[in-house]
């Protein structure tokens, strides 16, 4: 079931949550709506579900306009962040709830419902837990039961609102892998909301990056990370080093230093610009070389296989972040307080008019 979002806008009083949103989601896709708090991602999800009405614009499921269709008639499965399981019902009763409240003519038999529950418990790897209550389950198990309940009614579309947000980091990572595998097996069109960049990049087929009620970029996880189209996307998807200077025929002038910039800048003779690069795209050397910036190591900390360094440059006014593989760090034998030479690589160029305030 494909989803088409056409010119959708939504305001809450004077606050504009969504501004002229257009988006197409293909049948069987798993799409992440990624953005900071207040970016409009949950409002968009609720409008797709029919839980909120858009001020303008339309929603289509396949070719059917569902803008005015009640949420109960949209055949949508919705999974909330905090499970929303019925505490007084067993696991089996929670999963089967949507089936048991169907109109009598549409309701499966008790035998069919019991069989469906068994199938779904097997699907979410929780066989034998039919008679347990939510309080007897871990957070990860509760969320899997919530997902099984959403799938029980065989929805055309599955919507998930920060489904792993209430769980600890290890459980979140395990459930991400499980959700990706489950989606590959089930192939239901799915949209999930998250503010977790790693989660969006790890799980989804495509990422929709949102900011201030607008879509900044849509693309595969690799596309949005490696080819960000705006400063916001670049900054939101990970740590970044920022250099401000003037571009002149292939180089950006940073006070006393020059950086070679992407080929797009060769035709620019003298224009203010901002250069972005990731900490893992920073090379460190003990020898001065072309495009190198002298900097003093101020802080070093190790996290697993990565060494994270903070260096001062430009008369101690600005900090550079560098990430090195632990082996490379030990090979260089770097020490706090020493001066090294940093060469930024994989530079992305933005101009002042591209920044969103």
UniProtKB/Swiss-Prot annotation:
UniProt key word Cell membrane: yes
InterPro entries: AAA+_ATPase (IPR003593), ABC_SmlMolc_Importer (IPR050093), ABC_transporter-like_ATP-bd (IPR003439), ABC_transporter-like_CS (IPR017871), CysA_C (IPR041193), Mo/tungstate-bd_C_term_dom (IPR008995), NA-bd_OB-fold (IPR012340), P-loop_NTPase (IPR027417)
Residue stretches making up the ABC transporter domain: 3-237
Principal EC category: translocase
Residue positions binding ATP: 35-42
GO cellular component, one term: ATP-binding cassette (ABC) transporter complex
Keywords: ATP-binding, Cell membrane, Membrane, Nucleotide-binding, Sulfate transport, Translocase, Transport
UniProt catalytic activity: sulfate(out) + ATP + H2O = sulfate(in) + ADP + phosphate + H(+); thiosulfate(out) + ATP + H2O = thiosulfate(in) + ADP + phosphate + H(+)
Signal peptide: none
Protein name stated in the entry: Sulfate/thiosulfate import ATP-binding protein CysA
Originating species: Halalkalibacterium halodurans (strain ATCC BAA-125 / DSM 18197 / FERM 7344 / JCM 9153 / C-125)
């Amino acid at each position: 079931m494909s989803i088409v979002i056409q010119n959708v806008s939504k305001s809450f009083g004077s606050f504009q949550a969504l501004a002229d949103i257009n988006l197409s989601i293909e049948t069987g896709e798993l799409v992440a709506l990624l953005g900071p708090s207040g970016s409009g991602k949950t409002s968009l999800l609720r409008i797709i579900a029919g839980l909120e009405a858009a001020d303008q614009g339309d929603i289509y499921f396949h070719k059917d306009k569902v803008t005015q269709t009640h949420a109960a008639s949209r055949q949508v499965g919705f999974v909330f962040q905090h499970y929303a399981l019925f505490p007084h019902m067993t696991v089996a009763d929670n999963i089967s709830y949507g089936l048991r409240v169907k109109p009598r003519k549409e309701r499966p038999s008790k035998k069919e419902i019991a069989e469906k529950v068994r199938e779904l418990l097997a699907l979410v790897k929780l066989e034998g837990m039919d008679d347990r209550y939510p309080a007897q389950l871990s957070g990860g198990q509760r969320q899997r039961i919530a997902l099984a309940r959403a799938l029980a009614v065989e929805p055309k579309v599955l919507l998930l609102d920060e489904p792993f947000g209430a769980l600890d980091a290890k459980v979140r990572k395990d459930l991400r892998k499980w959700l990706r595998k489950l989606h590959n097996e089930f192939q239901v069109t799915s949209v999930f909301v998250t503010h977790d960049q790693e989660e969006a990049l790890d799980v989804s087929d495509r990422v929709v990056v949102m900011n201030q009620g607008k879509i900044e970029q849509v693309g595969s996880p690799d596309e949005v990370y490696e080819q960000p189209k705006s400063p916001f996307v670049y900054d939101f998807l990970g740590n970044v080093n920022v250099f401000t200077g003037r571009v002149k025929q292939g180089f950006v002038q940073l006070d006393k230093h020059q950086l070679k910039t992407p080929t797009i800048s060769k035709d620019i003779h003298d224009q203010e610009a901002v250069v972005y690069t990731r900490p893992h795209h920073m090379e460190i050397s003990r020898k001065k070389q072309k495009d190198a910036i002298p900097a003093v190591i101020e802080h070093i900390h190790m996290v697993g296989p990565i060494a994270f360094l903070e260096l001062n440059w430009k008369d101690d006014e600005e900090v550079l972040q560098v990430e090195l593989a632990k082996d490379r760090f030990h090979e260089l034998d770097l020490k706090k307080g020493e001066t090294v030479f940093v060469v930024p690589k994989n530079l992305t160029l933005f101009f002042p008019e591209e920044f969103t305030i």
